[in-house]
Amino acid sequence: MNTLDIDKPPSSTRVVVAMSGGVDSSAVAALLKEQGYDVVGVTLQLYDLATSGIEPGACRPNTCCAGKDIHDARAVADALGIPHYVLDFEETFRRDVVERFAQTYLEARTPVPCIECNRTVKFRDLLGVAKDLGGDALATGHYVRRRPGVDGPELWTGRDPGRDQSYFLFATTRDQLDFLRFPLGDMAGKEETRAIAARHHLPVAAKRDSQDICFVPDGDYAALVTRLHPDAARPGEIVDTAGKVLGRHGGLIHYTIGQRRGLGLGGGPPLYVVALEPETGRVVVGSREDLNCLTIQVEAVNWLGGDETELRVAVKVRSTRPAAPALLRRLSGDRAQVILDHPEQGVAPGQACVFYQGERVLGGGWICPSREA
């Protein structure tokens, strides 16, 4: 077996690398080339800022810029002397990621588009492209680990907790894991990745990480939803948990669970968004204690564990939060129930709930509104 757990010498192993133009995927291509693999780079054209209606000057620092990123990916491929292909996936990305993002907001949920992009465009579609190119594996720059297990490869967190991206990859299927490789998962930190890029004199060695959603580089999510659905921002009432009207709002798309700012309610104790009601158009506000949640209903579960139907786990309800201890009950179909040991605040429908045992990812799903509990 070679270093990618493939029964071939590296020189006979074709690895297709998903090259975004950033330092991580560029370092992956360089590392595999250095190890003697037959490396092919592929970059996806996903989003054209010129047709987005956003002025380039309005973009935040450290956001994606499709044209420059493609240019950077090609420059890296040229520096490494590897073939490089740019594929137009704009229509697929618009349908499966951008439109779903907007639709999730219309349902008064808070989306995580990076998960949908990984699940559909990057792993479903790009994986097919990699096979068409004769690849034995598809490698990406994600900070996660792929480990052999009794029932096949398992998904594990990245070695560096600060860089771990497993939350965004919970929807990866077993079949996809069989073909995927994550060479950066065992890296001690970003400095090690940048050192690889610098050693190979790659033009992106010092490039900053992108921070915002690539198709909303100005950070104005509501404006994007409104461009796609002009009637999305319907005004409505702001009420307390007893139903008393406290004020008015300019549309549910401007709010998420746990939000405090932007309510326009002066005076009194701090109030937080505790529920969004798409049926009535109401924003429900309450105290910080009203945000407490002990039981979470989860749908569209992707399961990577064993046959257990009830087990102790740790769960993440947002990518930036530490995993919290809980009891997981797998229900019929693709549903699950999570009972937390201690209340979590601001559990938002539409976000992912990801299940862990130690460093292993057991899967995850999408958080349902409490009314569906």
Swiss-Prot record:
Full protein name: tRNA-specific 2-thiouridylase MnmA
CDD domains reported for this sequence: MnmA_TRMU-like
Active site: 117, 214
Reactions catalysed: S-sulfanyl-L-cysteinyl-[protein] + uridine(34) in tRNA + AH2 + ATP = 2-thiouridine(34) in tRNA + L-cysteinyl-[protein] + A + AMP + diphosphate + H(+)
InterPro entries cross-referenced by the UniProt entry: MnmA-like (IPR004506), MnmA-like_C (IPR046885), MnmA-like_central (IPR046884), MnmA-like_central_sf (IPR023382), Rossmann-like_a/b/a_fold (IPR014729)
PANTHER family in the record: MITOCHONDRIAL TRNA-SPECIFIC 2-THIOURIDYLASE 1, TRNA 5-METHYLAMINOMETHYL-2-THIOURIDYLATE -METHYLTRANSFERASE
Alphabetically ordered keywords of this record: ATP-binding, Cytoplasm, Disulfide bond, Nucleotide-binding, RNA-binding, Transferase, tRNA processing, tRNA-binding
Enzyme Commission number(s) from the entry: 2.8.1.13
Species, as recorded: Paramagnetospirillum magneticum (strain ATCC 700264 / AMB-1)
Gene Ontology biological process terms, A to Z: tRNA wobble position uridine thiolation
